[in-house]
Amino acid sequence: MGETPVYLRARVRTRYPARITRLPWLAGPLASAGFAKPRGVRRLTRKLAKALFFGLHGRLGLPAPGEMEVPAPAGVRRIPINGANTAFLAYVQHLEAGGYEPEVSAFFDHVAAGGGVVYDVGANWGYYGVLLATNPAFSGTVHAFEAAPGTYRDLEATIDAAGLGDRVTCHRMGLSSEDGELPLVTGRHSALARIERTAGRHKATMVSVRRLDSLDLPQPDFIKIDVEGHELDVLKGGARLLEGVRPVVIFENWFDPDQPAATLAPLNFLTERGYDLYDLMWEAPVEGRRVLRRRPPAAGDGAENTLALVPLPISERMARRRDLNVLAWPGDRAGITARFEATPFSAELLELC
């Protein structure tokens, strides 16, 4: 008889250390609207604010000063931010909607708190560096990689102004399957910048790229990858590292119905190297029974919930949500069962909405 299927669970507290206290005035209507689709006058107001915001701060390059509070050993620091970077706006919108990548944030605070080396690939303004470096239990270091020149300036400025440079090292480069230069396609939203070998009609900037295997840095214990479809190239460039060092990997995976093979390629690449895949979800009580769902039952900074690492067979990827943060844990690496409790699993527990 085979082993009883299990998922892994742990009680966690979600923490959002960075608090944006001021955005450019044109960003106000955009942030307050959140992810809901406004109607009537609100829709017109938002549309006008959006056009002015991108026209003034994007096309014309006018300054868009904002402010963020970050905890520091000597007290809270108020640091300037570039409000033209829409990733700051998205951070505010997600927090108002209940949380910013709550499952990944909680995972890192829970698992990486003891120390180690973390690579943040596609760091943008440095949220995960700030998250880890402001955790009193974290004794490790973060290497934050960002290829887009303007976004890298925001990353470096955030880490420097927050006084976190001794814990977070910023690298102006992308990671790929080769060393050299590749075109980076940028647009209105910094979080959607992507390396694209055949940029075509899109506006592209040539950026420096390196392979994970060619970096002269401390070997990573954890790698977080958010590179808008370039995940497989990043993994291929670190094949030797993945097979030898065996870091834990978390990466964004989008289901593209037109290219299902591209969706599954990073998953196959990792499982072929002995990694176990997990879907990060939340355990919640519903009508007297336990279910596994996408949204945490309790939301916001300081909320306590039960994080669930649910097995993700590749054959079931298309049945899950379109966008997933996938956890890849080396099957031969100890530690996961020490931090999570194994619990019997059945497909009936899944609430896949």
What are these model-predicted stretches?
Residues 149, 156-190:
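Core alpha/beta nucleotide-donor-binding catalytic domains of modification enzymes
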